[in-house]
Structure formats: C-alpha cells, structure tokens
C-alpha cells in the first residue's frame, strides 16, 4: 500500500497539525510505502513573502523530521522540486468540473466576500492537491477532517479520468483519525486550532516553551460545570479530553474515567503536563536539525529525486492516455 500526504509550510505548526496529521505521517512509515512532501506551491496561492516562505519550508521540514519521519523509511521532499505535479495538475483540470471547485468549503472560507479578487491558484488548489496524490498512485491519504472534501474531489477526478481515458489512475481513500482529528482552539473551542484564524492564547505550537504551554492550558475556556466529560454544552472540556487522549494514545472514555473525581483546574494542569512531555523531544530534535540547513537541503533534494522517478511514470501514462505528446509504450 502506498501512502501520500503533504503539509503546508505556512506559519508555525500547532498541536492540531501535529495530532491530526504529523503523527499519522510517522505511523504511515510502518503501514506501507510512505511519500510525504512540504507543499510550497500551495502556499503561494495566497499573499506571502518569498524569504519567509523559504524559511517556513525549512522549519516545517525540520519539524516533520524531528517528529519521526525517516528519509530511509519514506520519501520526503519539497513539492516545487518535482515539476510533474504542476503538469499533471493542468492535465487533470480538463476533467475537473468548475462547479465542483466552486463548492469547495475551504475556497469559500478563504475567499470570503472578495471572491473576485483572490488568485485563480486558490480556486484550483484542489486540482493541484489531486495531482499531488494521484502522481504517486497512492491508496491512502492521511488528512484531517477538514480535508475530507478535497479527498472526495480527487476521487471524483480519478474516476472521471479513468471512465473517459481508460484505467490509469489509482482512486485514493482518506484516512482520518478517530480521536484528535480536529483539535479546537483553547479560547474558542467551537472553532479548530489554527495558526492564522485562531487566538494567540488558544493555539499551542509544537515549538512553544513549556511555560507558554502551561499558561495556555491553564487559561483554557471551559464551562460553569465541574464534570470531566464530553457533551453538547461542554466543548471546552471535550476538547481537553480529546487532546489528552490523543497525546496518551488512549480513548476519551479512559480519560473521563481517570479524571471523573478531579476539578477543572487539576485536569487542565494534567493536560498541560502531558502536552509538555509529549512535545519536548520534538522541540529539541527540531532545533538540532534546523541548525544544519545544508544537510536539510540535501535530505529534501534526495527525496525529490526518488519522487520524480515515480511521478514521471504516472505523468507518462496520463499523457499517453490523453493523446498528449508522441506515442510511447505504456508501462
């Protein structure tokens, strides 16, 4: 089984990114042939600063490696180093319906009332995402719940292509974790934790110092009750339960049983301590990896060479199926 996923190099990685995506990347190395990339081409669909983007690519790559990605057990690269992604995106756009793209939730959220002013790249973002995955004939796509619609679109694109041009592309499946898929903002638990749309005190970053993490959890919004349990009117406590369950690798029911006699203050401290212990080794490894930028660049370049060997074969198959370019023997 082949696994593919990517992560944007925008902003610092927060606890939601880590639990919802990065831990799945690491686990994927044991489930099959894992291919991961830092998707810098997606990052340029909104306003950005070039120098900051390059730094963010390195920061993101270092975080992923610190979390446990092993270039000896997976293919890990920078998206823009593999031009097959962009050519395949253009070819797939010919079988992607305008209406499908117009219904994408993330496009509506990011474009807001200024839809006529946003880039065409933001609108066609899901097609590039489809190309990212389909280029590698991936079966399994680990994503957060908010990306489910994008995986459904890439499935539709692959099925439409195969129906029109013959069986060429593998139709992927989304893999969404049962616990922690959506870690919410500590100050506004009705919305997910976010680097751009979240609150400063409500977002816990992977590289936060221990004191900052503890402070954020101590001030986390809860409710006027006292029971450590999930419920429709207990979004804040429910979020903390899910966070603790995720970092411990247990079910939320186990957390509820363990802390049923605890008060909110003690429970918040327990969650904070668990998160500090969970992230401390990652922060230390990140700092060491990030200090060797030349070594980090070599790792990404080596991964890109391996990725191109696969993506170029897929692109050739797609071109041949569509009648684009000279006739060549198909694999």
Feature-to-residue mapping (PLM):
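Short, histidine-centered active-site or binding-site loop motifs used for metal coordination
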Residues: 7-9, 40-42, 139-140, 197, ...
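Conserved nucleotide- and phosphate/pyrophosphate-binding catalytic cores
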Residues: 149, 155-331
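N-terminal Rossmann-like or analogous alpha/beta NTP/dinucleotide-binding catalytic cores
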Residues: 2-131, 274, 287
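An acidic site on a long C-lobe helix of protein kinase domains
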Residues: 56, 84, 149-150, 236
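A generic secondary-structure signal for well-formed alpha-helical elements
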Residues: 61, 68, 96-99, 138, ...
């Amino acid at each position: 089984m082949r696994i593919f996923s990517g992560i944007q190099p925008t902003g610092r990685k927060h606890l939601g990114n880590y639990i919802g995506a990065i831990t799945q990347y690491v686990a994927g190395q044991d489930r099959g042939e894992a291919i991961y990339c830092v998707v810098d081409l997606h990052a340029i669909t909104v306003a950005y600063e070039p120098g900051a983007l390059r730094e963010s690519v390195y920061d993101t790559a270092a975080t992923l490696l610190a979390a446990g990605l092993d270039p000896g057990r997976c293919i890990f690269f920078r998206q823009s180093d593999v031009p097959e992604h962009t050519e395949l995106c253009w070819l797939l756009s010919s079988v992607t319906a305008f209406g499908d793209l117009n219904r994408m939730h993330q496009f509506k959220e990011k474009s807001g009332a200024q839809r006529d002013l946003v880039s065409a790249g933001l609108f066609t973002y899901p097609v590039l995402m489809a190309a990212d995955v389909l280029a590698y004939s991936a079966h399994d796509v680990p994503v957060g719940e908010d990306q489910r619609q994008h995986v459904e679109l890439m499935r539709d694109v692959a099925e439409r292509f195969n129906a029109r041009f013959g069986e060429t592309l593998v139709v992927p499946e989304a893999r969404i974790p049962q616990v922690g898929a959506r870690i919410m903002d500590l100050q506004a638990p009705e919305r997910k934790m976010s680097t751009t749309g979240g609150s400063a005190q409500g977002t816990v970053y992977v590289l936060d110092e221990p004191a900052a993490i503890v402070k954020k959890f101590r001030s986390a919004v809860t409710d006027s009750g006292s029971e450590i349990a999930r419920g429709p009117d207990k979004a804040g406590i429910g979020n903390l339960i899910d966070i603790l369950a995720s970092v411990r690798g247990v079910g939320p029911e186990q957390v509820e049983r363990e802390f049923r006699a605890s008060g909110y203050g003690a429970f918040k401290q327990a969650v904070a301590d668990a998160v500090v212990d969970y992230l401390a080794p990652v922060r230390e490894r990140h700092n060491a990896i990030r200090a060797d930028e030349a070594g980090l660049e070599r790792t990404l370049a080596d991964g890109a060479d391996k990725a191109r060997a696969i993506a170029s074969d897929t692109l050739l198959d797609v071109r041949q199926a569509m009648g684009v370019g000279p006739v060549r023997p198909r694999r």
